[in-house]
């Protein structure tokens, strides 16, 4: 049983169940790259920063065919441990995603990566995201084996996930795999192993799927879109409606 695009509970077995798997940082950095392209590295375009406040359940719903229904959206990310502003923005966004009934957040972690400075030779430590690829691969394969979906939509441009897709095709050949590439992300390997025509996520899809500027949680404090992500007016969809309803 799942929620259809009109917000109704559906038991229609003729609908093909879809789980969407979103590589959070691959999507984020794809949008950030576009913001830099349209502005500068020091001053990225604010019109693209606003898409960081993204309604991923609505986006996943927009990728469906009429014969499909959205069963779940799995969002893979890692908690930021440095930079107060970055932490506050991420926390606000994750709180917003937690209000969406079909979204599940799955965490990896950041690990310090030691590198020597090219100029002075002194060691420097940069955070390196860990476990995201493994988490996506594990969920993709296990969900296929447990018959949790008919079609898996994978939002990423990371070719490290090719072996996981190959495993799904080998173990459950009846499952359909679809790749949806974030902005500025593409992999011939991913497109080839999935088969079929990949989806390209660009501005029209992002523009129509911004979260509301204010999300009311009744007993909990309201969630306010961070100033950096406010950009210009975006989605005006009332949040008490199903975000998949257009």
Describe every region a protein language model picked out:
Residues 2-126, 176:
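Domain-level signal for Mg2+-assisted phosphodiester chemistry and nucleotide/NA-binding surfaces
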Residues 104-246:
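Nuclease catalytic cores that cleave nucleic-acid phosphodiester bonds
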